[in-house]
From Swiss-Prot:
Keyword Metal-binding appears in the UniProt entry: no
Function text: Catalyzes the hydrolysis of N(2)-succinylarginine into N(2)-succinylornithine, ammonia and CO(2).
Name by which UniProt lists this protein: N-succinylarginine dihydrolase
Top-tier EC class: hydrolase
Similarity-based family: Belongs to the succinylarginine dihydrolase family.
Entry keywords, A to Z: Arginine metabolism, Hydrolase
Gene Ontology biological-process annotations: arginine catabolic process to glutamate; arginine catabolic process to succinate
Residues annotated for substrate binding in this entry: 19-28, 110, 137-138, 214, 252, 365
Name of the encoding gene: astB
EC number: 3.5.3.23
Subunit structure and binding partners: Homodimer.
Pathway the protein takes part in: Amino-acid degradation; L-arginine degradation via AST pathway; L-glutamate and succinate from L-arginine: step 2/5
Entry annotation: catalytic residues: E174, H250, C371 (nucleophile)
Length: 448
């Protein structure tokens, strides 16, 4: 049966700013307090969506969160009208206002973990919103994420939605940024690959010393159970703690997989040979031929991988059977990385083409092409059941660019977050967006 991988990219929200909120994310920390350009950021993301759509890939849109989140601020003791809440927070606790104004939901690889129907016990596509409990500014996302996903995938015959895991450190879950899937064809049963940074309950697993490991083994196992995955179709691997301490805060900063191919750095995992052997064996039993492309540290150091976001790329299957690697401009600007990519595409391997995108606004906050998208493999009848308002078309692209032009600012600094007018601008924009994308009422300000 025909099936497609659809990339649902996060639409950058109107409060996109450089708050430096993500400890362990080198780019986020190093660009803290710089002036951002929300309008440019949103258009850069939309340009990538349009370009991939025009290349023949299925492309969708995931709406941003409503920010500033005044409900979160109220839960922290700020009272009065929404405007007074913002004013008080700006005066008394600016870091909290910055956190509650973050546009980090643009990185939809962290929105949820998705298992296609070919892998699940009940034959439906399963979604579990990520609790993102390692960072306060992201931990407040999942209630809205769940409502948005339910509005996009709203046919219970085809789609099952699970609430986020318990919001405690033992079940820290960062979603699809630590998950990929291997398969012969998108509609076939595949092998789901869960990567964790530490175990909450088993001290035999090592842990990083400098930066936190955001994903636990126990969270991965819980999601696999919720989705009804069989043991024959799951592989768990531990990310190398040493690379977490070098700024690899999610596995999609050090590896990317698609189809039968895993593109990874030599230092990405612990027990690499054992992990690759299990993937090879389990995918082979499901009719596939697993292939790993290992990037040696002598050719690309971990530091270069983090700076360029070589692995935070999209690996896409083309109609001719070859693969396209979508990378940020920073890869072309790094001589060692670019030399490697030129050699890679010159080999007789599956990755034959590299396409470069300017995503500087997102990159400066620590998110590349892979961060910006949530992959959902859908059979034809499942794709037909998706809310059509969120599927990218030439017309929707034009509508969204015009919407951005009407509502977004072209510069935003920390002081601007204290402007109560920003809240009204954002709510007006998002109220209109839910009509454009045919989502109904998904934001708290629409439900109150």
């Amino acid at each position: 049966m025909n099936a497609h991988e659809v990339n649902f990219d996060g639409l950058v929200g109107p409060t996109h700013n450089y708050g430096g909120l993500s400890y362990g994310n080198v780019a986020s920390q190093s660009n803290s307090q710089a002036l951002s350009n929300p309008k440019e950021a949103a258009k850069q993301g939309l340009a990538k969506m349009k370009a991939l759509m025009e290349l023949g890939f299925k492309q969708g849109v995931l709406a941003p969160q409503a920010r500033p989140d005044t409900a979160a601020l109220r839960s922290l003791g700020f009272s009065g009208s929404d405007e007074e809440v913002i004013r008080r927070a700006a005066k008394e606790a600016m870091p909290l206002l910055a956190a509650c104004s973050s546009a980090s939901s643009m990185w939809t690889a962290n929105a949820a973990t998705v298992s296609p129907s070919a892998d699940t016990a009940d034959g439906r596509v399963h979604f579990t919103a990520a609790n993102l409990n390692c960072k306060f500014h992201r931990s407040i996302e999942h209630p809205t994420t769940s409502r948005v996903l339910a509005a996009m995938f709203n046919d219970e015959r085809h789609f099952a939605h699970h609430a986020a895991l318990p919001a405690v450190s033992q079940f820290g879950d960062e979603g699809a940024a630590n998950h990929t899937r291997f398969c012969k064809d998108y509609g076939d049963a595949g092998v789901e690959f869960f990567v964790f940074g530490r175990s909450a309950f088993d001290s035999r697993f090592p842990a990083p010393q400098r930066y936190p490991a955001r994903q636990t083994l126990e969270a991965c196992q819980a999601v696999a159970r919720l989705h009804g995955l069989s043991e024959a179709g799951v592989v768990y691997a531990q990310q190398n703690p040493a690379v977490i301490d070098q700024g690899v805060f999610h596995n999609d900063v050090i590896s990317v997989g698609n189809g039968e191919v895993l593109f990874h750095h030599e230092d990405a995992f612990l027990d690499t040979e054992k992990v690759l052997a299990e993937l090879h064996d389990k995918l082979g039993r499901r009719g596939g031929r697993f292939r790993a492309i290992c990037v040696p540290r002598e050719q690309v150091a971990v530091e270069d991988a983090v700076k360029s976001y070589l692995f935070n790329s999209q690996l896409l299957s083309k109609a001719d059977g070859s693969m396209l690697l979508v990378v940020p401009e920073e890869c072309r600007n790094n001589p060692r990385v670019w030399n490697y990519l030129e050699r890679l595409t010159g080999d007789d391997g599956p990755i034959r083409e590299v396409k470069v995108f300017d995503l500087k606004q997102s990159m400066q906050n620590g998110g590349g092409p892979a961060c910006l998208r949530l992959r959902v493999a859908l059979k034809e009848q499942e794709l037909a059941a998706v809310n059509p308002g969120v599927i990218m078309t030439a017309g929707l692209y034009d509508t969204l660019v015009a919407w951005v032009d009407r509502h977004y600012r072209d510069r935003l600094g920390e002081a601007d977050l204290a402007d109560p007018q920003l809240l009204q601008e954002c709510r007006t924009a998002l109220d209109e967006l839910t009509q454009i994308l045919k989502l109904g009422s998904v934001y708290s300000f629409q439900l109150d």
